[in-house]
């Protein structure tokens, strides 16, 4: 079995609790926030917290590369204003260092927003520059850009945006992408039928490249196709439907990366994980 499915679990009470929460739902991968995602700063990890996390992870059998930490929602590496961008950069740097302390090798983030104050190209260049600065100051952690639904002034919804960011990143060995199925669908890439799925992923491969795929968010969508609205749903009850998730579970291009549920009903995550594994031919 080369698929590693889990969910974005709570780290409330300490990051080490995320491991237990992942195990409770039968996950082989998980995502977490390493700090409160709605605050700029957090107290530093003490050595006890780090040790407890690493010990719990080792006991769980979940590999560090199948853990996909997510950064704070406040961070905007493409911010049009320098002061605000620097504040985001400092917070992002701290998040990367937190991952490093926990022995994790990737950090998932939303690329950024132009806030209708600068052009898309300027915003994308800001994101790449911010990434370069963080990569210079850190080691061992890859920066994983998430595709977005394109809601508001958020960039990253087009594969070309992701490619443009990567193009200007100097150390391409430490950059990756995370594709969210809900965002992909809402951004206008159809994945509902075998033909549409193959076409959309073919575009992804041509424009970005599968070598950069370091994680996925597995979500159905409440919003209609191409609506640019980001509303997740439980698997099979949204606009995408179950076939897409069958395709993914049998697509070897998605092997050995964290496949993370962010579906809206956490009480059925264990069932959704079992469902996904039942799709494997």
UniProtKB/Swiss-Prot annotation:
UniProt-annotated binding residues for Zn(2+) 1: 70, 110, 146
Catalytic activity field: Endonucleolytic cleavage to 5'-phosphooligonucleotide end-products
Cofactor: Zn(2+)
Principal EC category: hydrolase
Positions contributing to Zn(2+) 3 binding: 183, 230, 232
Keyword terms: DNA damage, DNA repair, Endonuclease, Hydrolase, Metal-binding, Nuclease, Zinc
UniProt-listed CDD domains: AP2Ec
Residues annotated to bind Zn(2+) 2: 146, 180, 217, 262
Cofactor details (free text): Binds 3 Zn(2+) ions.
InterPro entries the UniProt entry points to: AP_endonuc_2 (IPR001719), AP_endonuc_F2_Zn_BS (IPR018246), Xyl_isomerase-like_sf (IPR036237), Xyl_isomerase-like_TIM-brl (IPR013022)
EC number: 3.1.21.2
An example molecular function term from Gene Ontology annotations: DNA-(apurinic or apyrimidinic site) endonuclease activity
UniProt-listed GO biological process terms: base-excision repair
NCBIfam families: nfo, PRK01060.1-4
Similarity field: Belongs to the AP endonuclease 2 family.
The protein's role, per its UniProt record: Endonuclease IV plays a role in DNA repair. It cleaves phosphodiester bonds at apurinic or apyrimidinic (AP) sites, generating a 3'-hydroxyl group and a 5'-terminal sugar phosphate.
Name listed for the protein in its UniProt record: Probable endonuclease 4
């Amino acid at each position: 079995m080369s698929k590693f499915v889990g969910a974005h679990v709570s780290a409330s009470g300490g990051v080490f609790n995320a491991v237990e929460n992942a195990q409770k739902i039968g996950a082989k991968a998980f995502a977490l926030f390493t700090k409160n995602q709605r605050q700029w700063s957090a107290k530093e990890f003490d050595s006890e917290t780090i040790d407890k996390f690493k010990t719990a992870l080792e006991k769980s059998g979940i590999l560090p590369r199948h853990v996909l930490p997510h950064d704070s929602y406040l961070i905007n590496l493409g911010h049009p204003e320098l002061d605000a961008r620097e504040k985001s950069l400092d917070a992002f740097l701290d998040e990367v260092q937190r991952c490093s302390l926990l022995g994790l090798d990737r950090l998932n983030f939303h690329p950024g927003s132009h806030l209708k104050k600068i052009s898309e190209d300027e915003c994308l260049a800001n994101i790449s520059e911010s990434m370069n600065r963080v990569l210079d100051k850190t080691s061992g952690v890859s920066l994983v850009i998430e595709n977005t639904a394109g809601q508001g002034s958020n960039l990253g919804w087009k594969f070309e945006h992701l490619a443009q960011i990567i193009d200007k990143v100097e150390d391409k060995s430490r950059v990756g992408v995370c594709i969210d199925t809900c965002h992909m669908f809402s951004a206008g890439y159809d994945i509902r039928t075998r033909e549409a799925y193959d076409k959309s992923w073919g575009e992804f491969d041509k424009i970005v490249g599968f070598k950069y795929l370091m994680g996925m968010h597995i979500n159905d969508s409440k919003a209609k196709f191409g609506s640019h609205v980001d509303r997740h749903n439980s698997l099979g009850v949204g606009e995408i439907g179950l076939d897409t998730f069958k395709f993914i579970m049998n697509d070897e291009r998605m092997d050995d990366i964290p496949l993370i549920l962010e579906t809206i009903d956490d009480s059925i995550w264990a069932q959704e994980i079992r469902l996904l594994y039942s799709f494997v031919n």
